[in-house]
Amino acid sequence: MKQLKIFKIILIICFISIIPTAFAQKGTYVDEIKFIQYLDENTALEEVKNGNLDMYYYRISSDRLEDSESRDRLKVYESTGGYYSILLNPTDEGPFNPFSIQEVRYAVNFLVDRNLIVNELLGGYGTPMFSNYGSFSAEYLRVLDVIETFQFRYNPSFAENVISEELSAKGAEKIDGVWNYENEPIEITFFIRSDDPVRKAIGEILSSELEEIGFKVNKEFGDLNKAYVVVY
């Protein structure tokens, strides 16, 4: 399985200069807007706190908002800034790939504890997603009735039963707690983004769940640039 949680990072700072003098009736409140790119989030936040920048226009990780001290001299606006996703490789070419089986891909939904991710990893700053349309999407209501029929929730026992049934039907055997196909352990290559603590944690958690099921998981770590090369 190859994994990539897609979220391109662009850090932009907006600096606004207020006109101190009179202006025409149809004039603007500013005479200049500067956009400055910061690659270091810590530097950008300190610049805002010190009054050198008026706005930091990008998401802030939840661990930086845990207490009143971290919010000091900051006014935080909540918005939908992106999402975390897990991509499964469905190819049936090459070595045996359990994710080429639709029912196995379906079962993975029950190995993901979305509430844990939202509450623990994101500090409550998020909502669980069960499709490519989130609850804030205008299209969400169109697919809501379909999503509800799947009853996706964290249920590893159900996932294991589905996966075991499908693998057994393909001739795989579980030997000493490890799934084997044609006398070879079934291996999964899992690419995990290590340049983001949330993505890294999600990858580690799901890897453990897959190992509990009986797969041999080879974890490969890397940043977004490596993901583009390795995954795509």
Describe these PLM feature segments.
Residues 81-107, 111, 120-121, 193:
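A bilobed periplasmic-binding-protein/Venus flytrap-type ligand-binding module shared by bacterial periplasmic
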Residues 25-31, 102, 156, 160-189:
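Immediate post-signal peptide segment of exported/extracytoplasmic ligand-binding proteins
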Residues 5, 20-40, 67-82, 174-176:
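Aromatic-rich, solvent-exposed beta-strand/loop patch
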Residues 9-18:
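Bacterial N-terminal signal peptides
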Residues 44-45, 95, 104-105, 226-231:
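Short, hydrophobic alpha-helical packing/hinge segments within bilobed ligand-binding/sensory domains
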Residues 128-174, 194-200:
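Structural transition elements
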Residues 47-48, 53-57, 65, 211-232:
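Periplasmic binding protein-like
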Residues 30-37, 44, 55, 185-193, ...:
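Short, well-ordered beta-strand elements
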